[in-house]
Amino acid sequence: WAKELQFIAQAGLTYTKDLFDKERFERIREISAEIMSLQSKLPLSEIKDLFCNETGFQTPKLDTRAAIFKDNKILLVEENDGTWSMPGGWVDVMETVKSNTVKEVKEEAGLDVDAVRVIALHDRNLHNQPPYAYNVCKVFVLCKVKGGCFHPNIETVGSGYFSLDLSLIHISE
């Protein structure tokens, strides 16, 4: 409910023209940050950075992930913290789902790909713990490799194709 209060406050701040209502919506936003801080055990200042710096109508953040298959195995990249994930990341401003997926695969896996089609949408907070203070919609895109090869970089230290039974590796959330 803290996120719902944040959403209501953000929408109110976006559309109100009344100065008194603006003050009320700002207070609702502060209360939502205080609640989230208590629930999450994160410092209030960190929560305020997430909640109170947003402007405009609040929407979920968008993340793309590339589904790349070879010989009935899926490509994963090893992140700097030792966890593994499908190549991908936040959709940058001015990028489309397709262009962001292609860009992220090149950056993280060193591969040139064609983004073929969207194969799944995933609400991160419904399926992963702990929930984020904001909503994330993950878009999974089927990709075909055209070329390239992996080189360690600032985001990833390894890549490989893995059996679809992923129970043996530590997957990032």
Where are these regions (language model features)?
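Active-site-adjacent beta-strand/loop module that shapes the phosphate/pyrophosphate-binding cleft
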Residues: 72, 124-149
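Secondary-structure edge/capping motif, primarily at the C-terminal ends of alpha-helices
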Residues: 9-16
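N-terminal strand-loop-strand
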Residues: 48-85, 113, 117
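The catalytic Nudix box helix
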Residues: 85-120, 141
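Conserved small/polar residues in nucleotide/adenosyl-binding loops
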Residues: 169-173
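Acidic, metal-coordinating catalytic segment for phosphate/diphosphate chemistry
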Residues: 19-65
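Short amphipathic alpha-helical heptad-repeat segments
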Residues: 1-6
